[in-house]
Each structure stands twice: as structure tokens, then as C-alpha cells.
């Protein structure tokens, strides 16, 4: 683990900066965020297991956080429908990616059975809760790697952001979302930094620290960690929307 973390000393993965200052207007966060997610489709066939159709990205996110927690508490693992909805949330802004991953999965019973089995096995090994301990988080990624080949949509070696998205929904208060645009927002611009474990682990610890700052709301529906992530998205500027962000990441899935 130490070797992984030390690798980032060679570049600015170890020099992340928080662009969210004390003047950030949190009262407009939802509005600004929603304006970046216009490709969201509440009637998507990949949301078949979501009982109350969400009206936007945020509503789906909060529904999934609740659904994942409820399923893990009741039966120890998340179901296929929840998994597919998470993939859709990650990929919906890029039609090619949803066709290449979500549509193929929805039309392939063998893939569905394989994922079902993997989710049960993974759920049996994942702890119900984790703390902000980087060694424990690294263990989660190692465990998810072992199941990666069976989890369609996560098996690409470059799909680190997607694997992080799954872990985020499993542990929304501890594992932050991670991708290229988040890294750019905090000043990391190395090519393929979003595929590097050392940058990931540095960012996780950075997000833990920064999300505890007093200016971030603590009593909203989303966790402070998620609110920090949303603020990074909108702070990236008007020209880099959430959809563009996901589009950049979605290119990972074209070779599945």
C-alpha cells in the first residue's frame, strides 16, 4: 500500500487543491447541478426496478442510496435491477455507452445470471459499514477486483471510476465518486490519472478532509462527501457540464 501511495509524489496527485471557497453559494447547488443533467430520462428501461420514477439525476441518486442500503440490510446484497440502475446513472449522458453496456446487459440473460451470482457472493464478503481508513478502502477495491470479470460494466481494467461509483453507493458516506473531471477540478491534469490507484487513494483521503469543512451543509439529504462532489462538478465551469464529464468517462466502456 505504501508503494502505491508514494507513487503519486512524482506528480500533482499529491498536490490537490480545494476550489470550493467560503463564498460558494450552497443555496443554488441543486439548481446548478440539475442544469448539467439534461439527458436524464426517467422512463429509461434500465430503471425498471425503481418503483417511483425519479424526475432527475438527483432523485435517482437518492433513491439508489436508499435502495442499496435497504437491500443490503434485508438480504445482504444488492439486486440486479439496482446494479443496472447504478450503471445507468453513471452512463446515461452518453448514448453509445448506455447501448454498449446497459442495453447489452438488459438483453443478455447469461450476463444477468452471472451478475446475480456475483452480487450475492460479493455481498457476503463486503462489510456492511466501513470507516475512513485507507487500508480498509483498498481492501474493498481488491475484493471488487476479484469479482470484476463477472460484473459486466466493471470488467474493463480502465473502469476504475465505474467501480468507484458502485462502492460509493455501497458506502455513500465514506467512498467519494472519482473520475477525470473531479481530478481536473482539484488541479490534477496528468493523462490517465483517473485510471491510477495512487491518484484514487490520494483523492479519497483529500475528499475526507475537505468534506468536513464547516461551510459544507451537514443536514441535507446527501452526505457532506456527496455535496462536496456536486460542488466540484458545478465549479468546473459552465463549459464542462456533468454530461460532458460522464461522456469523457463513458469512453471507457466502448470496448466491452
Predicted ranges, named:
Residues 92-158:
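Helix-hairpin-helix/helix-loop-helix acidic hairpins
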Residues 86-93, 105, 147, 167-171, ...:
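Generic structural signal for hydrophobic core residues of well-folded globular domains
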Residues 142-187:
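Catalytic DNA-binding helix-loop module of base-excision-repair DNA glycosylases/AP lyases
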Residues 76-80, 131-134, 156-160, 176:
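Alpha-helix initiation and capping sites
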Residues 65, 87, 138-141, 204:
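A generic alpha-helix structural signal
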Residues 60-107:
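Small-residue-rich anion-binding loops in enzyme active sites
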Residues 1-80, 176-256:
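C-terminal accessory module of base-excision DNA glycosylases/AP lyases that mediates lesion recognition
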Amino acid at each position: 500500500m505504501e508503494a502505491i501511495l508514494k507513487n503519486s509524489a512524482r506528480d500533482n496527485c499529491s498536490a490537490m487543491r480545494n476550489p470550493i471557497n467560503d463564498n460558494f453559494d450552497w443555496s443554488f447547488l441543486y439548481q446548478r447541478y440539475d442544469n448539467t443533467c439534461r439527458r436524464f430520462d426517467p422512463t429509461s428501461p434500465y430503471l425498471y426496478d425503481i418503483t417511483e420514477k425519479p424526475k432527475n439525476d438527483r432523485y435517482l441518486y437518492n433513491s439508489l442510496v436508499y435502495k442499496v442500503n435497504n437491500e443490503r440490510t434485508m438480504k445482504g446484497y444488492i439486486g440486479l435491477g439496482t446494479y443496472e440502475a447504478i450503471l445507468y446513472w453513471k452512463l446515461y449522458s452518453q448514448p453509445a455507452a448506455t447501448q454498449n453496456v446497459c442495453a447489452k446487459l438488459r438483453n443478455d440473460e447469461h450476463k444477468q445470471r452471472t451478475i446475480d451470482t456475483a452480487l450475492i457472493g460479493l455481498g457476503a464478503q463486503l462489510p456492511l459499514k466501513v470507516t475512513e481508513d485507507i487500508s480498509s478502502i483498498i481492501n474493498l477495491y481488491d475484493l471488487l477486483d476479484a469479482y470484476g470479470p463477472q460484473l459486466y460494466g466493471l470488467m474493463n481494467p480502465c473502469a476504475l471510476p465505474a467501480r468507484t461509483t458502485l462502492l460509493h453507493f455501497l458506502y455513500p458516506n465514506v467512498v467519494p465518486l472519482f473520475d477525470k473531471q473531479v481530478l481536473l477540478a482539484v488541479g490534477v491534469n496528468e493523462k490517465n490519472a483517473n485510471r491510477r490507484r495512487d491518484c484514487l487513494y490520494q483523492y479519497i483521503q483529500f475528499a475526507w478532509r475537505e468534506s468536513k469543512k464547516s461551510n459544507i451543509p451537514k443536514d441535507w439529504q446527501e452526505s457532506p462527501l456527496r455535496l462536496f462532489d456536486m460542488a466540484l462538478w458545478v465549479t468546473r465551469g459552465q463549459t464542462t457540464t456533468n454530461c460532458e464529464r460522464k461522456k469523457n468517462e463513458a469512453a471507457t466502456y466502448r470496448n466491452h
